[in-house]
Structure formats: C-alpha cells, structure tokens
C-alpha cells in the first residue's frame, strides 16, 4: 500500500534522469517485472520528507539487488547495468552530483557510480564505498550475493540519503558504488585513478569507509552476541565510535575474530580499501564477517538479520555525522 502510494512520485522523478542514464544498456521500461521491482526501492527516496522504516528500506534495497531478475550482478552483465542504473537514480534523487567512472578489466566494462556532496569552503573529502557487482550466474545457477555485497550497497544508499551539514570543519562526501570487486577488485584501483584525474589526491582524502558484507549475524566474534559489528581500522577512533554507539549497544570489534593474521589480510589485502591504504589514506572497513553462505547460491536476502543490520547502519550514520 505504501509503495503503491509512492509510485506517482517515482514516475515524476524518474523522468528527470532516465534520459541521462540511457548509457546503461538494460532497458528497464521494456521489462515490466524488472521495472516494478526497480521502482519499489527507489520510490522510497522519491518523496522528500516521507518517513519510512529503516529496516524496511534496507530489506527493499537488498531484495531488489539480490533478486533473480538481476542474476547476481556480474560485472558487464545486464543485471549489473540495471543495478548501476538504479544506484545512479537513487543518488540523483538524494540530491547528489552523479558521476560515472567507466573502466575496463579482463575484457569487461565496469562502472563505478559516484554521488558527490560538496560543501562551501571544504577542501578535504570523505569517501564512502561499497562494491555492487556479484558473481552472477555460474554453472547455470544464480549467485544472489545478498550479504556479499548487496547489504553493503544497501547501507551505502541509506547513508547517502542522509545528506547533512557536518559538525566542525566541513568535508565533502563522495559515495561510491564500486564495480569489479570480483574481477581483481579493479573498481577500487579505477576509483583511485579517477579521483586523481579530478584533482582529488590522497592527501586531500581525510577518510575512506568501506562497507563490505554487512547484514549477517550468523558468525559473531567470540564473547559477542548477534548484536555485533566489526570495524577494521577503527581502533584509533574507538572513543568516537563508543559515543556513537550509545543506546544502540552493538558489540564493536576492531579485529577480525581475534586473529592478527586474518585482520591484516581482510583489512589490507582482500577489499577495496587496500588501494587507499597503500597511499597512506586512513581507512575503516565495516563488516559482519564471512559466513557459510558467502560465495554460494544460498547467499539470499532471507539470510540477513535486518533488525541488527538497521542498527549497524544507524551507528555508522551517527559516527559519520561527527566528521
């Protein structure tokens, strides 16, 4: 009922950007099922001022991105193009300046989607990113990649919609949906090069936040309940994180399950923040860890714990407001 009521607002806003986004190959207008599924989550952002439940929004974003119609969002696929189209429209509806960073890797064309919010007098940047490509269809089976990493993209969208006036010295915000995670993390490298081409060098980036696999509670760290969140690289900001966690009561961990080796691997080698770390940029990677569903056909939207997921996103939102 709520979504049906929102559809006129979506249709009005969609006309503003559909022509601009014609570069994306998939034509959602010709596929009524995909068009309906596409409109539902985007409609939640189309009417400014309408309050809607955070948990329900996250469910809607993940359900669309991990749905059968997008077939796992493999880089260069029609499903990936549909996801890119959706994300760019979402950013535009949120009032962000949208840029598309196109790159090639392993014979595929990738697209990083950037949503930028600049503030007068600000000369430093905070980059918030999540990879949106998945494994796609392998051996005739679809790998939905809901937790890894439709969940991170859902968190990214929610944070991008919270355009706020920073506390203290203002910083510009760049929200990035990265392509190419499953093709050598090529989107992260392409992003570094693209930002440099725009005059945004490592010295002007105050922080990079990577949202990578955010929605599960199946593998809590030792001594924690299911209400946990892992923040690799966050130890030096433990006080501000503790303050932002007031009332949310998440169990925050600053290492990967107590293992120094795995912490170094996940923080420095197996996700896109590694490209920025190599340049000396401070980074935090938020994750809920790998589960038995990761990189399997069972990584579906139904396996996520949305009440806890919503609290994680709210925590990151509060923490970012302190920048």
For the regions a language model picked out, list residue spans one by one.
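His/Asp/Glu-rich mid-to-C-terminal helical/loop segments that flank catalytic regions of hydrolases
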Residues: 24-26, 291-323
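Second-shell loop/turn segments in exported
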Residues: 43-52, 68-78, 103, 140-149, ...
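Metal-dependent peptidase/peptidase-like ectodomains
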Residues: 168, 178-283
């Amino acid at each position: 009922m709520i979504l049906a009521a929102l559809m006129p607002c979506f249709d009005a806003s969609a006309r503003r950007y559909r022509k601009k986004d014609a570069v994306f190959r998939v034509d959602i207008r010709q596929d009524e099922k995909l068009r309906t599924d596409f409109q539902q989550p985007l409609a939640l952002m189309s009417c400014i001022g309408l309050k809607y439940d955070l948990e329900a929004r996250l469910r809607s974003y993940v359900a669309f991105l991990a749905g059968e119609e997008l077939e796992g969002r493999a880089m260069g696929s029609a499903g990936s193009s549909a996801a890119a189209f959706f994300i760019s429209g979402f950013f535009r509806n949120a009032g962000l300046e949208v840029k598309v960073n196109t790159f090639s890797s392993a014979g595929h064309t990738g697209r990083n989607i950037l949503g930028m919010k600049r503030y007068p007098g600000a000369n430093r940047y905070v980059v918030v990113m999540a990879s949106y490509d998945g494994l796609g269809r392998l051996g005739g089976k679809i790998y939905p990649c809901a937790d890894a990493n439709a969940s991170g993209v859902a968190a990214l969208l929610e944070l991008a919609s919270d355009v706020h006036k920073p506390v203290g010295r203002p910083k510009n915000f760049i929200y990035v949906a990265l392509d190419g995670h499953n093709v050598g993390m090529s989107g992260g490298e392409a992003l570094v090069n693209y930002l440099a081409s725009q005059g945004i060098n490592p010295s002007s980036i105050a922080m990079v936040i990577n949202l990578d696999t955010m929605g599960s509670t199946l593998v809590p760290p030792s001594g924690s309940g299911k209400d946990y969140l892992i923040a690799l690289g966050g130890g030096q900001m433990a006080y501000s994180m503790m303050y932002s966690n007031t009332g949310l009561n998440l169990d925050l961990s600053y290492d990967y399950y107590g293992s120094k080796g795995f912490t170094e691997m996940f923080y420095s080698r197996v996700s896109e923040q590694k490209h920025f770390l190599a340049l000396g940029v401070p980074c935090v990677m938020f994750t809920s860890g790998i589960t038995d569903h990761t990189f399997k056909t069972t990584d579906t939207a139904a396996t996520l714990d949305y009440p806890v997921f919503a609290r994680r996103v709210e925590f990151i939102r509060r923490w970012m407001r302190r920048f």
